Amino acid sequence: MGQTVTTPLSLTLQHWGDVQRIASNQSVDVKKRRWVTFCSAEWPTFNVGWPQDGTFNLGIISQVKSRVFCPGPHGHPDQVPYIVTWEALAYDPPPWVKPFVSPKPPPLPTAPVLPPGPSAQPPSRSALYPALTPSIKSKPPKPQVLPDSGGPLIDLLTEDPPPYGAQPSSSARENNEEEAATTSEVSPPSPMVSRLRGRRDPPAADSTTSQAFPLRMGGDGQLQYWPFSSSDLYNWKNNNPSFSEDPGKLTALIESVLITHQPTWDDCQQLLGTLLTGEEKQRVLLEARKAVRGNDGRPTQLPNEVNAAFPLERPDWGYTTTEGRNHLVLYRQLLLAGLQNAGRSPTNLAKVKGITQGPNESPSAFLERLKEAYRRYTPYDPEDPGQETNVSMSFIWQSAPDIGRKLERLEDLKSKTLGDLVREAEKIFNKRETPEEREERIRREIEEKEERRRAEDEQRERERDRRRHREMSKLLATVVIGQRQDRQGGERRRPQLDKDQCAYCKEKGHWAKDCPKKPRGPRGPRPQTSLLTLGDXGGQGQEPPPEPRITLKVGGQPVTFLVDTGAQHSVLTQNPGPLSDKSAWVQGATGGKRYRWTTDRKVHLATGKVTHSFLHVPDCPYPLLGRDLLTKLKAQIHFEGSGAQVVGPMGQPLQVLTLNIEDEYRLHETSKEPDVPLGSTWLSDFPQAWAETGGMGLAVRQAPLIIPLKATSTPVSIKQYPMSQEARLGIKPHIQRLLDQGILVPCQSPWNTPLLPVKKPGTNDYRPVQDLREVNKRVEDIHPTVPNPYNLLSGLPPSHQWYTVLDLKDAFFCLRLHPTSQPLFAFEWRDPEMGISGQLTWTRLPQGFKNSPTLFDEALHRDLADFRIQHPDLILLQYVDDLLLAATSEQDCQRGTRALLQTLGNLGYRASAKKAQICQKQVKYLGYLLKEGQRWLTEARKETVMGQPTPKTPRQLREFLGTAGFCRLWIPGFAEMAAPLYPLTKTGTLFNWGPDQQKAYQEIKQALLTAPALGLPDLTKPFELFVDEKQGYAKGVLTQKLGPWRRPVAYLSKKLDPVAAGWPPCLRMVAAIAVLTKDAGKLTMGQPLVILAPHAVEALVKQPPDRWLSNARMTHYQAMLLDTDRVQFGPVVALNPATLLPLPEKEAPHDCLEILAETHGTRPDLTDQPIPDADYTWYTDGGSFLQEGQRRAGAAVTTETEVIWGGVLPAGTSAQRAELIALTQALKMAEGKKLNVYTDSRYAFATAHVHGEIYRRRGLLTSEGREIKNKNEILALLKALFLPKRLSIIHCPGHQKGNSAEARGNRMADQAAREAAMKAVLETSTLLIEDSTPYTPPHFHYTETDLKRLRELGATYNQTKGYWVLQGKPVMPDQSVFELLDSLHRLTHLSPQKMKALLDREESPYYMLNRDRTIQYVTETCTACAQVNASKAKIGAGVRVRGHRPGTHWEVDFTEVKPGLYGYKYLLVFVDTFSGWVEAFPTKRETAKVVSKKLLEDIFPRFGMPQVLGSDNGPAFASQVSQSVADLLGIDWKLHCAYRPQSSGQVERMNRTIKETLTKLTLASGTRDWVLLLPLALYRARNTPGPHGLTPYEILYGAPPPLVNFHDPEMSKLTNSPSLQAHLQALQAVQQEVWKPLAAAYQDQLDQPVIPHPFRVGDAVWVRRHQTKNLEPRWKGPYTVLLTTPTALKVDGISAWIHAAHVKAATTPPAGTAWKVQRSQNPLKIRLTRGAP
């Protein structure tokens, strides 16, 4: 089955030298690449039967040659040498071609489908297929193909195909049957036959037809059928890739099988069913049916032809006939085409881009893989010369980085071929360094880098030491010298020694260490100066200070201080932690310098607690213990013979401990010995269970974890943060330990996250913490199943009072990571001493990963499942790595602990022996103290809360509330206590700590000190919940019966939401019960709950009042509280406010429904029924409506016939607010009377009866906590409800049409409110502004014009006050009005209408003279408004000038068409203004050269030279080239106004028509080639009737549009054209009957008068900016008009004509308002004045 298939194309490529020789004999030259392209891709598209593998059939070659030599644009002259050479190969075949050429091939049809009939010819195909052609009567001698020896029929080791003879037709075979029988010779069977197809008969030696397997000639001369063997199908299936993996390889296999075996239709189905899946087979069959061609050689979709050529069901083809075999041959060809089409992958350039060169891959192998990717994932042929550039670029960019960089730097890269690039890449590849050389180079670079860094560090250290000693040596010289003299017993400084002088005996010639007089005995013990002295060294690399010195612990680290009574402040030399912002100057012998203080949050313990802050002086040689700390310690310095001793006031040695505030609670923990100490027995019996004896754990039953990533995740690489030397040295031992244990391993990963060194509090030890936040974002989220500590202890019954607590050490490291997930957690680490410089990653589950707790918790639960089953009497609680084992007796606890330790050891987990609490009755677990079935708060946690200082910032307050909130279960009413504190925690709120906050702060601390013990929930007993409510806070206690007593389980408290807090007390109790029941469910775990409260709320829940509760809230409460299986209500009890437990004495219960009914309304006697003996019966109404764009509102109180009160309300008042005002006014006017008031407003009615009381109790807040609308009006209404003696507010329908009293009164009130809204002044006394005497200047200056105007208006003069009065107001003079309004407008820049409305709404105390005229003048003369405001001027339409005959006047324009296929992005459109005829040309550029070219080459030859051309001011038209061409040709080129498309309206409208038509055509045809569809769009434009009912075609040619039926079979009748004389007569008629009337009509339009614009020469105008930026005025100017036309004008300063629609008039102040210059008394000053208009 491994035979290679030989085709004519492959045969020519194998003998390419002979092919070139034959081509040279034909005087042509051929190239191998183009030879393959033409044969496999080009010639099969000619539809003449040329196969992709080539053929030597002369008939097909002749047809291809005729297509190649076709004259005109359809020919292919570049293919002539190749088809001529191929024809020469067929006519004069060389020896290697002769076996594949028929002696005399008959002419072949153009289509592969054979017509029926005995004389039908077979379809053309490759010569390797059996040539089923009729034999020639004069049969030539049989060629000697095979040797006479009995060799195999087909040699499987050679590539040459077997010879095939000619196949005779059916009729010829019948006529020559006898001759063939007599002349046939039978050859001996081949030994290879059995190897090929099993038991097959040898073929007839003299047979004239070839054998088409599996059809064989039997002994009686009949064809027999031989199916595929199962071994063949099995080998083909298993030894080849699937169709989806490599479609090309499987297609080649099936093609070879179709050629060599000649299967029938059934065999083909069997072959496809074996090698392909169902979906692949369906796709192949569908593609094969698409390849069926009709009689015209084109693909067909006719069902009959498709089913005939490629049937889906078994056909009745007779394989013994020529017609049946031809059908079968065609079926195989179509099947092969379907395989090829179905195997084509969709274009995916990303796959090609993903092919990169491997580290050790040669460039040649990489290029082959790249080409294969091009063939598989793109439709491009990588061997095509046109694709060589793309392949070359991909080869460069996707090569190895070192090769790619060097290839990019090649000189003259554009001229390099792909072969040149491969050769250069091979040179670079061969010169690469070996892996050993690369490792050696990297090692040398690392060593050099480390050596440089080490030298730099040493140099920097030496410089720092030198500078420090130089600056501070003189500072302490006196102290050091004096102390040395004290030790030596003298007061003089010892003399200077020579270089060779002994310091002991003062003799020369030796040193002190070699002095013979120096005693050699053992050194005596040093005197102890402190109990906490751990050594003499004061710091790393520092000599101990001289005596007297004392060693103290600072932050857990021993520091040796020099006692310096001359130092005012104590000094630390090394970084003690965080430094404060305070600093101080230190004056020394060498000068002064500023140093910082440490923070004062340090607690020191010696004789007492003190707080101290050190001075941080890193340049000081030794730490100093100054007078400040000596004073606080009450230290005593005694001078003895051995030196100075520093002790406390009682004579004891001093000891000082410094630690952080968060670890302070550990000081208060009592170190109590456990009842059963963890001795050597537990350690020795279970060595594998303890981390101290068993080493690092490993969960043996857990498979390595695979961490799934999100679908869109990509690797993240974050560089390592800079790390100090101290931190690096601190975490180095931990990294080394983890590397030795195999938990960390070196790696190379695209992922990288930084490592953070975290300093352990109280020590100098660091631990490594990895920042995995970015990795956590890219990992899939899993649901967290870690238990909730809040209710975890609910599963611990009080009967189990013996406990064992185990803490698993390094728990996460017990779980392994899968190798595929390990690169996610890589980080950088460099350690030159260990030879590590790169990345490390975790092989175990790391800490800091978001899913680590859940994964470990689930794994440990699975591993401990068997232990729980085997020990059902024990309780095992697990919170991640903290285990709690509880038992009823000590023996059961010890037995269970042993079993648990054995299980943990076997499973591979390790517990910490230091933290273990084994078999005790009192243990600490999760921050609680468990003892005797109860849980307590630990004293350490209480002390932590008590020791916190008073908060000074919101953050400190949040920390306090968080710490105290952990203990809220022990504090009754915690929510109510902390209520004053929570508002200060919000961001943006002023932190104002007052007495209320201090009181709450102290109450919480006091409650915490008196916190009781809480019993553990017993899930076998029912729970009781006592609930109380006070001022919107729900409080409760959850209890369980313990004998005759109730033992508290938890104290619950919560604040109610704003809606529930505004309810009556009984309903607030319902809300409180619902809130606390939900919280208690977390502890009761669904057990029965009995609710006891001082209210009978069960009846309220069953029948809640609909006026207070919404439906959603009512349903929620009923579903929670009426679940009788879980919740039951107990009797009504009175609770103790302190303990929330029932009181001994019982109070009389109250009726909640009755109390609730009483609280529904604000006024008890308020009713909605008329009062019979009422004093007044009034009707109220309020209205709000829009009038002239302004909302007007009014309100009224009326009877049936008269208006009691009415008034206008401020503009913008809503109808609801107006109704409230009207009702409130009626109540005020009926004070002390009996009143019936009718209103048609449901809003006002419900507010008075129901909602008002609800709003008041709620604090006038909505359910979201926001202030309600109309708050002031609602408050006024609630206050006015109590004014009448008796009151009835009745609701009546609005807009009634009846004649009842209600209808008449409602209509009267509605009409009165509407009339009141139209008034200008509000008359209601409740909303009147108190009248006040307006401020009057000392005097008003009235001009003569003002006085004349005042007399005309009838004003009176007030002699007392000295001003004129009109309408009861002082009159402001015209000049003062101008100054006031001008200032107001400059502040607001409002329009005249808005300024009038503003002045009308804000009632002025003055009467402004000529106000409206002054407002108009001020706004019109404002320069800023003129430059910004839009213009409302409307310019009349002009008249467009048209030509008097076709071709004389054209409009031209460019329009852009996207997408720009083939480089065509623009369309140049010409429109004849006379006829509307359009010419459009696609162009690639928008230039003047293109315009001139189309004008001279297209417009001029067809229509003559235009007289006028119109266009916009585009660069292609306004350029010097276009204008010069127009001048030379005598064309009057008119450039239209800029930014005025209406000026070129005809061509602009045609642009839109053409683009709309192209859009429709592209949608209908499915193509994006608009250039191809442009003729159809032009046809539509030219044959569309215009405004006069004629199409441009009719105007131009004088004939109707050529609308014909293109599908009419009698279309030939329309081809008879009339004579030339008839055409001329028709044109003459058109000129007389069409052109002249059109020209006259156009002239009439020009003669009609056009309304000109109002601008004249000399006017000042503003010109519009067509392109404005941010904060830039819309208009520029003003400019002076120089010239005008009916539609345009030219201004001074702008060269182009401007359309009249783009300008607006500029108002200039009259001469009287110009600025005037006046002299003043000061000669250096002048006065500028301007009068009013």
From Swiss-Prot:
RNA binds at residues 721, 771, 773, 787, 851, 853, 1054-1055, 1082, 1184, 1186, 1242, 1266. Residues 436-476 form a coiled coil. The keyword ATP-binding does not apply. A motif (PPXY motif) lies at residues 161-164. A motif (PTAP/PSAP motif) lies at residues 109-112. The modification Phosphoserine is found at residue 190. The keyword Magnesium applies. GO terms for molecular function: aspartic-type endopeptidase activity; DNA binding; DNA-directed DNA polymerase activity; RNA binding; RNA-directed DNA polymerase activity; RNA-DNA hybrid ribonuclease activity; structural constituent of virion; zinc ion binding. InterPro entries: Aspartic_peptidase_AS (IPR001969), DNA/RNA_pol_sf (IPR043502), G_retro_matrix (IPR000840), G_retro_matrix_sf (IPR036946), Gag-pol_Znf-H3C2 (IPR039464), Gag_p12 (IPR002079), Gag_P30 (IPR003036), Integrase_cat-core (IPR001584). Residues 739-930 form the Reverse transcriptase domain. One of its GO terms (cellular component) is host cell plasma membrane. Keywords: Aspartyl protease, Capsid protein, Coiled coil, DNA integration, DNA recombination, DNA-binding, DNA-directed DNA polymerase, Endonuclease, Host cell membrane, Host membrane, Hydrolase, Lipoprotein, Magnesium, Manganese, Membrane, Metal-binding, Multifunctional enzyme, Myristate, Nuclease, Nucleotidyltransferase, Phosphoprotein, Protease, RNA suppression of termination, RNA-binding, RNA-directed DNA polymerase, Transferase, Ubl conjugation, Viral genome integration, Viral matrix protein, Viral nucleoprotein, Virion, Virus entry into host cell, Zinc, Zinc-finger. Mg(2+) 1 binds at residues 807, 881-882. The active site is at 564 (protease). PROSITE patterns: ASP_PROT_RETROV, ASP_PROTEASE, INTEGRASE, RNASE_H_1, RT_POL, ZF_CCHC. GO terms for biological process: DNA integration; DNA recombination; establishment of integrated proviral latency; proteolysis; symbiont entry into host cell; viral genome integration into host DNA; virion assembly. Residues 449-464, 484-497 have a biased composition (Basic and acidic residues). This is Gag-Pol polyprotein. It comes from Xenotropic MuLV-related virus (isolate VP42) (XMRV).
